[in-house]
Amino acid sequence: MIVATMSLSACDKSSSEPVYSSVGVEAFNYTSYNLDHFVVRDQYGNKASGGGDLMPGSGAGSVSCCYALKGTDFTVDWDVYDADAAQKQIDAQQDISVIRKTARVHMPPAEVKGKPGQNVLALHFYPDDHVEFEFRDDLQGARISYAKVDEWFQRTYGKAANPDNLDDAKSFRRTVRVAADGWKKYGLTSEKDLEQYVYYALIVNPRFDEYPAVQKILVETKGKPDAFGDAMRKLSPATVDEIKRFRPEQKEVVRG
């Protein structure tokens, strides 16, 4: 579902299509890749672009201005790359492998209330490669904070959070990959939910979500922000120990 926070725009006198003038664009990158560049195209030949090597979880405040767009149907093309793979390629004096992605976005007519240059079309890039549009009159609006999740994880678990002594950037990207997986598999977005997902996946058991009691929690808390995190924190030490020792082939035994 595409999110539009407002309801009606100015319309072209020669058609009923909405027209957005003097619009800035910013991207919020929730993928596990660095977002190098993006282009938004409407069906009338207009385009807007931005990017600038946005690391996972970043984008707020990075605005490109000013553009005109028209209509309700758009195509978004963007380039991403894996920062860990890129570093190896740089060390080997090779070109960085860039991945091109494309998505189509439908946005109902949206009212733009700010003055020219104050309106921002926020593009939310999700881990499953779908994109959502949202008009804003500020430079905020991030829906997933990987940085806060990783800061909590590193502060709370110390050496256990980074047992192989990766540098901060690599350790952060590892956290991001797991958190992004939590979104793709279960739609988790809140800090509480992602904190617990990362902890259990990286420290307790990478397949913890296949444990019957955890699967029950995932079903019962679906669509309820923070509920998964709260439920996982309440598990007894004995249950956590069982999850740590759990193997998927034992599932039927555990149920019995």
Language-model features: where?
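Sec-dependent N-terminal signal peptides
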Residues: M1-T5
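C-terminal motif of bacterial Sec signal peptides marking the signal peptidase cleavage site
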Residues: M6-A10
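Bacterial signal peptide processing site
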Residues: D12-S14
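Solvent-exposed loop and beta-edge segments used for protein-protein assembly and interaction
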Residues: V19, S32, A68-K70, S97-I99, ...
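Structural motif
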Residues: V23-Y33
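Short, ordered, surface-exposed loop/turn motifs in non-cytosolic proteins
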Residues: S32-D42
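Tryptophan-paired
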Residues: V40-A85
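Beta-strand-rich cores of mature extracytoplasmic or soluble domains
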Residues: D84-G256
